[in-house]
């Protein structure tokens, strides 16, 4: 699965000026990025503006001649209908630690290799942004990395087991089945234990920055939380950085 959408910390500069420096307008460069996503079979998030749901999809084809991109269709008519309603959606993906995003234009249904698919126009501009704190590496689904979170509710002593979707030096995305941790932006989750393989347990506070309901292929939903580290101790940060580097090195060696 793909990671949650990156939160761009604009600091003291104007957001429009900041993003303008990372916006591609060259058609050739935009097509190159889209084809890289297709070739690498990168999972893509389509963030629906109105319902705040996320569709997980992938790029199936890039057609330069008719100026279209073909995406895997959503699982469910309601989500497909919302996409085609013109209410707005954002295309977000991560390629080698670089965030690639653009606003989606008109969406239509089509067929690709005799299966239902979605067709969108090739964007006229595309944001390509990498900053150290936004660099995330996806974690394997087959052997999920656990994060144990004490319940944020005072009356509960429950230890909630979650699975990490991706991880970086600035934060993590995790799945919360049953929405037991809440989704309020700014909520602090204290005493979280990241059970990283082949390294010491990382203990930290996580701050919820964003949340989304993810529709799985079997039709069920799960809550995905994008969180940042708060006051991560230096020794824990060192363990974390080594882990991220090892995961990324192993991923590159498999390419």
From Swiss-Prot:
Q: Which UniProt keywords apply?
A: Bacterial flagellum, c-di-GMP, Nucleotide-binding
Which segments constitute the PilZ domain?
130-245
User: Which GO annotations describe the biological process of this protein?
Assistant: bacterial-type flagellum-dependent cell motility; regulation of bacterial-type flagellum-dependent cell motility by regulation of motor speed
Q: A single GO molecular function, which one?
A: cyclic-di-GMP binding
User: Where located?
Assistant: Bacterial flagellum basal body
Record InterPro entries: PilZ_domain, Split_barrel_FMN-bd, T3SS_YcgR, T3SS_YcgR_PilZN
Main localization, broad class: other
Q: Which domain of life is it from?
A: Bacteria
Task: Name the Gene3D superfamilies on file.
Answer: Electron Transport, Fmn-binding Protein, Chain A (2.30.110.10), predicted glycosyltransferase like domains (2.40.10.220)
Any one cellular component term from GO for this entry?
Answer: bacterial-type flagellum basal body
What the entry lists under Pfam families is as follows:
PilZ, PilZN
Subunit structure as annotated in this protein's UniProt entry:
Monomer. Interacts with the flagellar basal bodies.
HAMAP family per UniProt: YcgR (MF_01457)
What's this protein's function? Acts as a flagellar brake, regulating swimming and swarming in a bis-(3'-5') cyclic diguanylic acid (c-di-GMP)-dependent manner. Binds 1 c-di-GMP dimer per subunit. Increasing levels of c-di-GMP lead to decreased motility.
According to its UniProt record, which protein family does this protein belong to? Belongs to the YcgR family.
Instruction: List the protein's name.
Output: Flagellar brake protein YcgR
Q: What is the lineage of its organism?
A: Bacteria, Pseudomonadati, Pseudomonadota, Betaproteobacteria, Nitrosomonadales
